[in-house]
Protein backbone atom coordinates (compact mmCIF):
# COMPACT_ATOMS: atom_id res chain seq x y z
CA UNK A 1 0.00 0.00 0.00
CA UNK A 2 1.34 3.42 -0.95
CA UNK A 3 2.60 5.40 2.03
CA UNK A 4 2.27 9.16 2.31
CA UNK A 5 5.55 11.10 2.19
CA UNK A 6 6.00 14.27 4.25
CA UNK A 7 9.02 16.39 3.31
CA UNK A 8 11.03 18.37 5.85
CA UNK A 9 13.26 20.20 3.43
CA UNK A 10 15.32 17.45 1.81
CA UNK A 11 14.35 14.88 4.47
CA UNK A 12 11.61 12.48 3.37
CA UNK A 13 9.46 10.96 6.12
CA UNK A 14 7.36 7.90 5.29
CA UNK A 15 6.54 4.56 6.85
CA UNK A 16 8.36 2.60 4.14
CA UNK A 17 11.47 4.80 3.90
CA UNK A 18 14.56 4.62 6.15
CA UNK A 19 13.65 5.97 9.56
CA UNK A 20 14.19 9.60 10.52
CA UNK A 21 15.52 10.45 13.97
CA UNK A 22 13.78 13.24 15.87
CA UNK A 23 16.12 13.70 18.78
CA UNK A 24 17.75 16.12 21.12
CA UNK A 25 16.90 17.28 24.61
CA UNK A 26 13.65 17.66 26.49
CA UNK A 27 13.88 21.37 27.22
CA UNK A 28 16.43 24.07 26.42
CA UNK A 29 18.43 24.27 29.64
CA UNK A 30 21.10 26.58 28.25
CA UNK A 31 22.49 27.68 24.92
CA UNK A 32 25.78 25.87 25.48
CA UNK A 33 24.20 22.56 26.49
CA UNK A 34 21.85 22.66 23.50
CA UNK A 35 24.80 23.23 21.16
CA UNK A 36 26.74 20.38 22.77
CA UNK A 37 23.86 17.92 22.51
CA UNK A 38 22.99 18.88 18.94
CA UNK A 39 26.61 18.57 17.85
CA UNK A 40 26.77 15.03 19.25
CA UNK A 41 23.54 14.01 17.50
CA UNK A 42 24.77 15.48 14.22
CA UNK A 43 28.11 13.68 14.48
CA UNK A 44 26.52 10.31 15.23
CA UNK A 45 23.69 10.50 12.70
CA UNK A 46 26.02 11.63 9.91
CA UNK A 47 28.35 8.74 10.73
CA UNK A 48 25.47 6.24 10.60
CA UNK A 49 23.65 7.82 7.64
CA UNK A 50 20.44 8.52 9.56
CA UNK A 51 18.29 11.54 8.55
CA UNK A 52 18.08 13.84 11.57
CA UNK A 53 15.86 16.57 13.05
CA UNK A 54 16.93 18.31 16.29
CA UNK A 55 14.32 18.47 19.06
CA UNK A 56 14.02 20.70 22.12
CA UNK A 57 11.26 22.66 23.86
CA UNK A 58 11.51 26.37 24.58
CA UNK A 59 8.71 26.15 27.17
CA UNK A 60 7.38 23.16 29.07
CA UNK A 61 4.00 24.69 29.75
CA UNK A 62 2.45 21.53 31.19
CA UNK A 63 4.78 20.75 34.10
CA UNK A 64 3.07 19.15 37.09
CA UNK A 65 4.38 21.73 39.54
CA UNK A 66 4.37 25.49 39.15
CA UNK A 67 7.86 25.44 40.64
CA UNK A 68 9.33 23.16 37.96
CA UNK A 69 11.71 24.53 35.33
CA UNK A 70 9.91 25.45 32.11
CA UNK A 71 12.61 26.73 29.77
CA UNK A 72 13.95 30.03 28.43
CA UNK A 73 10.67 31.10 26.85
CA UNK A 74 9.64 32.02 23.33
CA UNK A 75 11.97 34.89 22.48
CA UNK A 76 15.17 33.42 23.90
CA UNK A 77 14.25 29.96 22.64
CA UNK A 78 13.94 31.16 19.06
CA UNK A 79 17.34 32.85 19.31
CA UNK A 80 18.93 29.59 20.44
CA UNK A 81 17.23 27.66 17.64
CA UNK A 82 18.46 30.15 15.05
CA UNK A 83 22.01 29.80 16.36
CA UNK A 84 21.78 26.00 16.25
CA UNK A 85 20.56 26.14 12.64
CA UNK A 86 23.40 28.42 11.65
CA UNK A 87 26.01 26.28 13.41
CA UNK A 88 24.91 22.82 12.28
CA UNK A 89 22.49 23.26 9.37
CA UNK A 90 19.94 20.98 11.00
CA UNK A 91 16.17 20.90 10.77
CA UNK A 92 14.43 21.62 14.08
CA UNK A 93 11.21 20.47 15.75
CA UNK A 94 9.64 22.15 18.78
CA UNK A 95 6.21 22.32 20.37
CA UNK A 96 3.74 25.19 20.64
CA UNK A 97 1.16 25.58 23.37
CA UNK A 98 -0.83 28.63 22.31
CA UNK A 99 -2.36 29.70 19.01
CA UNK A 100 -0.52 33.02 19.22
CA UNK A 101 2.85 31.21 19.17
CA UNK A 102 2.27 29.16 16.03
CA UNK A 103 3.44 31.53 13.28
CA UNK A 104 6.34 32.96 15.30
CA UNK A 105 7.68 29.47 15.93
CA UNK A 106 7.02 28.26 12.37
CA UNK A 107 9.07 31.17 11.04
CA UNK A 108 12.15 29.73 12.78
CA UNK A 109 11.81 25.94 12.99
CA UNK A 110 10.88 23.32 10.42
CA UNK A 111 8.35 21.17 12.29
CA UNK A 112 5.90 22.44 14.88
CA UNK A 113 4.58 19.94 17.37
CA UNK A 114 1.07 19.70 18.81
CA UNK A 115 1.42 18.49 22.42
CA UNK A 116 -0.52 15.41 23.50
CA UNK A 117 -2.48 17.25 26.18
CA UNK A 118 -3.61 19.85 23.62
CA UNK A 119 -4.18 17.68 20.56
CA UNK A 120 -7.96 18.22 20.46
CA UNK A 121 -7.84 22.01 20.92
CA UNK A 122 -9.35 23.20 17.65
CA UNK A 123 -8.18 26.82 17.86
CA UNK A 124 -4.60 25.68 18.30
CA UNK A 125 -4.91 23.14 15.48
CA UNK A 126 -6.29 25.79 13.13
CA UNK A 127 -3.52 28.26 13.98
CA UNK A 128 -0.86 25.63 13.41
CA UNK A 129 -2.45 24.52 10.14
CA UNK A 130 -2.41 28.07 8.79
CA UNK A 131 1.38 28.29 9.12
CA UNK A 132 1.84 25.69 6.38
CA UNK A 133 4.62 24.09 8.43
CA UNK A 134 5.07 20.36 8.83
CA UNK A 135 3.10 19.25 11.89
CA UNK A 136 3.94 16.52 14.40
CA UNK A 137 0.88 15.46 16.40
CA UNK A 138 1.51 13.71 19.69
CA UNK A 139 -1.20 11.13 20.31
CA UNK A 140 -2.84 11.93 23.65
CA UNK A 141 -2.51 9.23 26.29
CA UNK A 142 -6.30 9.27 26.59
CA UNK A 143 -7.15 9.00 22.87
CA UNK A 144 -7.37 5.73 20.95
CA UNK A 145 -5.30 5.24 17.79
CA UNK A 146 -8.49 5.14 15.71
CA UNK A 147 -9.47 8.63 16.87
CA UNK A 148 -6.31 10.19 15.47
CA UNK A 149 -7.93 10.40 12.05
CA UNK A 150 -10.18 13.16 13.39
CA UNK A 151 -7.19 15.30 14.31
CA UNK A 152 -5.62 14.75 10.90
CA UNK A 153 -8.93 15.78 9.33
CA UNK A 154 -8.91 19.03 11.34
CA UNK A 155 -5.53 19.92 9.91
CA UNK A 156 -6.68 19.03 6.39
CA UNK A 157 -9.75 21.26 6.78
CA UNK A 158 -7.34 24.01 7.80
CA UNK A 159 -5.39 23.51 4.58
CA UNK A 160 -2.45 21.53 5.92
CA UNK A 161 -1.89 17.87 5.06
CA UNK A 162 1.79 17.78 6.03
CA UNK A 163 1.08 15.83 9.20
CA UNK A 164 3.15 13.27 11.09
CA UNK A 165 1.60 11.23 13.91
CA UNK A 166 3.55 10.33 17.03
CA UNK A 167 2.66 7.65 19.58
CA UNK A 168 3.86 8.17 23.14
CA UNK A 169 1.91 5.51 24.99
CA UNK A 170 -1.55 5.17 26.48
CA UNK A 171 -2.85 5.44 30.02
CA UNK A 172 -2.80 2.11 31.83
CA UNK A 173 -4.70 2.71 35.03
CA UNK A 174 -3.33 5.57 37.08
CA UNK A 175 0.21 6.92 36.73
CA UNK A 176 1.43 4.42 34.16
CA UNK A 177 1.74 4.15 30.39
CA UNK A 178 1.85 1.21 28.01
CA UNK A 179 2.45 1.13 24.26
CA UNK A 180 0.06 -0.78 22.00
CA UNK A 181 2.16 -1.60 18.96
CA UNK A 182 -0.97 -2.63 17.04
CA UNK A 183 -2.06 0.99 17.27
CA UNK A 184 0.75 2.14 14.98
CA UNK A 185 -0.88 0.53 11.96
CA UNK A 186 -4.33 1.70 13.06
CA UNK A 187 -3.05 5.28 12.99
CA UNK A 188 -1.67 4.71 9.50
CA UNK A 189 -5.01 3.35 8.32
CA UNK A 190 -7.13 6.24 9.65
CA UNK A 191 -4.78 8.94 8.32
CA UNK A 192 -4.30 7.96 4.67
CA UNK A 193 -1.02 6.25 5.60
CA UNK A 194 0.53 9.35 7.13
CA UNK A 195 3.99 8.86 8.66
CA UNK A 196 3.90 7.41 12.17
CA UNK A 197 6.80 7.90 14.57
CA UNK A 198 7.36 6.57 18.08
CA UNK A 199 8.31 8.73 21.07
CA UNK A 200 10.06 6.11 23.16
CA UNK A 201 11.30 8.65 25.73
CA UNK A 202 7.90 9.77 26.96
CA UNK A 203 6.42 6.29 26.67
CA UNK A 204 8.84 5.35 29.45
CA UNK A 205 7.33 7.83 31.88
CA UNK A 206 5.68 6.71 35.08
CA UNK A 207 4.63 8.74 38.06
CA UNK A 208 5.00 8.88 41.78
CA UNK A 209 1.28 9.19 42.66
CA UNK A 210 2.01 11.90 45.23
CA UNK A 211 5.00 13.47 43.48
CA UNK A 212 5.41 16.69 41.52
CA UNK A 213 7.46 15.29 38.64
CA UNK A 214 7.44 12.26 36.36
CA UNK A 215 9.68 9.32 36.99
CA UNK A 216 10.82 7.00 34.22
CA UNK A 217 12.22 3.65 33.15
CA UNK A 218 15.41 4.57 31.32
CA UNK A 219 16.77 1.06 31.76
CA UNK A 220 14.12 -0.27 29.37
CA UNK A 221 14.62 2.22 26.54
CA UNK A 222 16.35 -0.25 24.22
CA UNK A 223 13.72 -2.96 24.66
CA UNK A 224 10.82 -0.62 24.00
CA UNK A 225 12.50 1.12 21.07
CA UNK A 226 13.42 -2.20 19.44
CA UNK A 227 9.82 -3.36 19.70
CA UNK A 228 8.52 -0.17 18.11
CA UNK A 229 11.01 -0.22 15.26
CA UNK A 230 10.10 -3.83 14.47
CA UNK A 231 6.59 -2.74 13.44
CA UNK A 232 7.93 -0.63 10.58
CA UNK A 233 7.57 3.09 11.25
CA UNK A 234 8.68 6.38 9.75
CA UNK A 235 10.79 7.62 12.60
CA UNK A 236 11.94 7.47 16.19
CA UNK A 237 11.68 10.27 18.75
CA UNK A 238 14.34 10.08 21.48
CA UNK A 239 15.70 12.54 24.02
CA UNK A 240 19.19 12.27 25.48
CA UNK A 241 21.20 14.09 28.12
CA UNK A 242 24.87 14.00 29.18
CA UNK A 243 23.80 13.84 32.85
CA UNK A 244 20.24 12.44 33.06
CA UNK A 245 20.23 12.45 36.86
CA UNK A 246 20.54 16.23 36.82
CA UNK A 247 18.41 17.04 33.76
CA UNK A 248 15.85 19.76 34.41
CA UNK A 249 12.99 17.75 32.91
CA UNK A 250 12.33 14.03 32.32
CA UNK A 251 15.84 12.91 33.22
CA UNK A 252 14.59 9.48 34.40
CA UNK A 253 13.45 8.73 30.83
CA UNK A 254 16.38 10.27 28.97
CA UNK A 255 18.98 8.20 27.14
CA UNK A 256 22.53 8.89 28.39
CA UNK A 257 24.12 10.91 25.59
CA UNK A 258 27.18 8.67 25.40
CA UNK A 259 24.91 5.70 24.61
CA UNK A 260 23.41 7.36 21.52
CA UNK A 261 25.63 5.72 18.90
CA UNK A 262 25.28 2.09 20.09
CA UNK A 263 21.56 2.66 20.59
CA UNK A 264 21.10 3.97 17.05
CA UNK A 265 23.18 1.16 15.58
CA UNK A 266 20.57 -1.26 16.93
CA UNK A 267 17.67 0.84 15.66
CA UNK A 268 19.14 1.15 12.18
CA UNK A 269 19.79 -2.58 11.94
CA UNK A 270 16.18 -3.38 12.88
CA UNK A 271 14.77 -0.74 10.53
CA UNK A 272 16.88 -1.95 7.61
CA UNK A 273 15.83 -5.55 8.22
CA UNK A 274 12.11 -4.92 8.65
CA UNK A 275 11.88 -2.70 5.58
CA UNK A 276 13.68 -5.27 3.45
CA UNK A 277 10.70 -7.61 3.80
CA UNK A 278 7.99 -7.58 1.11
CA UNK A 279 4.57 -6.40 2.24
CA UNK A 280 2.51 -9.39 3.38
CA UNK A 281 -1.29 -9.18 3.10
CA UNK A 282 -2.80 -11.50 5.72
CA UNK A 283 -6.39 -10.31 5.25
CA UNK A 284 -7.08 -12.67 2.36
Swiss-Prot record:
Keyword Cytoplasm: yes
Catalytic activity: D-arabinose 5-phosphate + phosphoenolpyruvate + H2O = 3-deoxy-alpha-D-manno-2-octulosonate-8-phosphate + phosphate
A GO MF label: 3-deoxy-8-phosphooctulonate synthase activity
Pathway: Carbohydrate biosynthesis; 3-deoxy-D-manno-octulosonate biosynthesis; 3-deoxy-D-manno-octulosonate from D-ribulose 5-phosphate: step 2/3; Bacterial outer membrane biogenesis; lipopolysaccharide biosynthesis
Keywords: Cytoplasm, Lipopolysaccharide biosynthesis, Transferase
Iron recorded as keyword: no
GO biological process: keto-3-deoxy-D-manno-octulosonic acid biosynthetic process
Top-level EC class as recorded in UniProt: transferase
E.C. number: 2.5.1.55
Signal sequence region: none
Gene3D superfamilies: Aldolase class I
GO annotation, cellular component aspect: cytoplasm
NCBIfam families in the cross-refs: KDO8P_synth (TIGR01362), PRK05198.1 (NF003543), PRK12457.1 (NF009109)
UniProt cross-references to HAMAP family, sorted A to Z: KDO8P_synth (MF_00056)
Name listed for the protein in its UniProt record: 2-dehydro-3-deoxyphosphooctonate aldolase
Species whose genome carries this gene: Erwinia tasmaniensis (strain DSM 17950 / CFBP 7177 / CIP 109463 / NCPPB 4357 / Et1/99)
Gene this chain is encoded by: kdsA
